[in-house]
Amino acid sequence: MTATPPPAVTAHRRIQGLDLLRGAAILLVLLRHSWPDLFGGAGIVGVVVFFTLSGYLITGLLADDVRRFGRIRYGRFYRNRFFRLIPALLFVLVGLVVMEGLLDVSDTRRFVPRTIGVALTYTMNIPLFNHGSPNFSHLWTLANEEQFYLVWPLIVFIGVRYRKLRVLVAVTAVVLVVLLVASVAWHRDDIGTIYNHPTTWTISMVVGAAAKLAEPRLDALIGGRRAAPAAAVGAVALTAMALVPDAKDHLVTYLVGGSAVGVSTVLVLWKLKEWTVAPRGVGLLVKLGVISYAVYLWNYPISWWLRDGGAPEVPVTTVVLSIAAGVVSWVVVERPVARLKARLETRASDGPKRPESVSAARS
């Protein structure tokens, strides 16, 4: 999920249009988990929207480091990722210990230690070994993002150092496509096997990163008065893909789905990034976007805990409980940690700023 500073701490840097996009993405995930027959592709679309936005934002943070300091501040980068991602993850793992360790509602008590280990090492997307409780298999998306956070700063650093960042981005995209095609070919008889593999959807993060690096060109191409029509096209495409029945079972989903959702997300993003304050009427979706990370963490296990616990199958109950858990996570864990991080940052000196052009990062 995308790591963004909480609004209560850094409201001057938060763009409500991006929270609106996050809210729409997590809503798609909620719809897919509760009404899979109607929203067959919504989970894929929602997750890949997050991936694309993550690639866009993280590349922006790294490029900003180059512009201001002439280098990537790795310590600060990974510290911020830790403060943003780990507390909410630990909170949902407490839920795992209670529901599956103490109460054993899913008959998975024996898997709890392994699940915690896999979750904290971000290896849920690595195939060919036991990941623990199936109720936490959705953490493959976090694994994808964390692995991206490990590799991408190094690519940006090398690209900036040798003024070949665009070339490296293109090479990375080609390598990912080759790996994806090979994976599809190898698993074509059981294509759903590759759904949560590391290379299946990572191309969308590179699409987001490329969009950030090409921002001036895209501003000229789909900015200004063209932004709204372009966003409408992107939104229609995302909606259509979200309604594809049994999307996980189609070979074409894996071959072009990541790129198609990534490009469509960029079209929508180019309009929404202008909305520092979102229009009236979408406030609830913006608020949902703020807590989207925690809602995602809790939604999938809650859906299974209800079923395994014998609760009546009322899909809307899962949605309501997931949002409630997200609110609790935000109020009890994420917001206090964000405030602590903000206090620590005010005490620390960033060092002398270096007015260096970011053009090197875009070469």
Task: Label the predicted regions.
Residues 30, 94, 120, 151, ...:
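Hydrophobic residues within the alpha-helical transmembrane core of Major Facilitator Superfamily
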